[in-house]
């Protein structure tokens, strides 16, 4: 019984037959029964498979990589009560974004349907704020109003067990308050609210204008 309890503290499992190696997040037996949906292999940043167990260990299980897999690339979805670990293409994309941001370079990530866009967006927005001290706010900008509630609920479900706050903006006034409150945080808002704030609400020379103008912000769109 004690041995079974010990496994309750494990967040990531690795299985291998030496020639093929996979990893997956700790899950209930019923979830694991679905098999391939929860088990994934590793690929390098050029998308070449890393199958050999020693090569996998060098790429994923060394320090600090193993720590980062848990601290930076694991999500506890509070709504679904499920532990999730990002897939390698998501991790490589976020790492590339972080490296580019440190050099003040913009970029984009290609995503297909069902590839985990929301979770990638959450972790990218979250990690930029956590890893780069000079960034005061990260803003996840949505281009359609109908996605606002959906994205906000997903982000807040991920953040419930995280070390970061996610604030939504129900209107332009709320957006201005979030931007001027002095807290380091992630903000979820729409392009329409941001445009309205810039074009109609902010007036040059006011305290709000000066504070927002001088903010160091990273946008994830």
Please place each PLM-identified region on the residue numbering:
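Conserved RecA-like P-loop NTPase helicase motor core
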Residues: 2-3, 192-195, 218
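Conserved motor-coupling elements within RecA-like helicase/translocase cores
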Residues: 171-187, 210-211
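Conserved ATPase-coupling elements of RecA-like P-loop NTPase cores
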Residues: 197-201
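SF2 helicase catalytic motif II
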Residues: 207-221
């Amino acid at each position: 019984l004690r041995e079974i309890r010990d496994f309750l503290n494990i967040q990531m499992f690795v299985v291998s037959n030496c020639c093929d190696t996979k990893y997956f997040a700790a899950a209930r037996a019923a979830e694991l029964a679905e098999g391939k949906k929860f088990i994934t292999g590793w690929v390098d940043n050029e998308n070449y498979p890393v199958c050999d167990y020693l090569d996998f260990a060098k790429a994923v299980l060394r320090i600090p990589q193993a720590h980062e897999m848990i601290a930076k690339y694991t999500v506890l979805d509070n709504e679904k009560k499920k532990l999730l670990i990002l897939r390698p293409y998501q991790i490589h994309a976020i790492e590339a974004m972080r490296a580019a941001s440190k050099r003040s370079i913009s970029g984009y990530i290609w995503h297909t349907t069902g590839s985990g866009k929301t979770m990638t967006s959450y972790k990218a927005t979250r990690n930029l704020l956590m890893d780069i001290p000079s960034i005061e706010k990260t803003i996840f900008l949505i281009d359609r109003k109908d996605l606002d509630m959906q994205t906000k609920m997903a982000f807040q479900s991920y953040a419930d067990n995280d070390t970061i706050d996610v604030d939504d903006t129900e209107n332009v006034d709320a957006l201005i308050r979030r931007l001027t409150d002095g807290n380091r945080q992630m903000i979820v808002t729409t392009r329409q609210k941001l445009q309205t704030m810039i074009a109609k609400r902010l007036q040059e020379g006011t305290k709000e204008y000066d504070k927002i103008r001088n903010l160091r912000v990273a946008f994830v769109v």
